[in-house]
């Protein structure tokens, strides 16, 4: 988990995401780059990334981005963008493992389902 090295929060959140998906989507794979950890099935559906790596003064240490075929309406999202006709990206700032509550776990599983 070299990408999350040095981030206690990042390591804990990645472990929680793995735990959540292990039971419902055991076929999930990970691709780690210098900038992110991407979770995939047939397609990518979630990305954990550290904004401070690029925006030194960023307020959030960690962001979970979820790809869905539709827009979710929630004030919890920092930003929602529509980069492609069939994809909505939902950016959630994560300040604690507790932020991955039942609502977020539901969104994560929905994104994994949609990625096929």
Question: Predicted segment positions?
Answer:
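Charge-rich, low-complexity N-terminal segments
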Residues: 1-19
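Generic surface-pattern signal
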Residues: 5-9, 22, 82, 113-116
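Structured alpha/beta reader/binder surfaces that contact nucleic acids or chromatin modification marks
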Residues: 15-31, 47
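Long, contiguous binding/interaction regions
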Residues: 19, 52-53, 106
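Short, conserved beta-strand/beta-arch hydrophobic-aromatic motifs that form part
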Residues: 31-89
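Well-ordered alpha/beta subsegment
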Residues: 84-116
């Amino acid at each position: 988990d070299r990408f999350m090295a040095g981030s206690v929060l990042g390591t804990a959140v990645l472990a929680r995401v793995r735990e959540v998906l292990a039971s419902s989507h055991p076929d999930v794979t990970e691709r780690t780059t210098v900038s992110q950890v991407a979770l995939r099935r047939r397609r990518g559906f979630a990305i954990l990334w550290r904004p401070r790596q690029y925006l030194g003064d960023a307020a959030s240490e960690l962001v979970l981005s979820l790809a869905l075929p539709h827009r979710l309406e929630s004030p919890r999202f920092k930003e929602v963008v529509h980069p492609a006709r069939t994809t909505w990206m939902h950016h959630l700032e994560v300040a604690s493992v507790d932020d991955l509550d039942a609502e977020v776990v539901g969104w994560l599983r929905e994104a994994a389902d949609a990625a096929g």
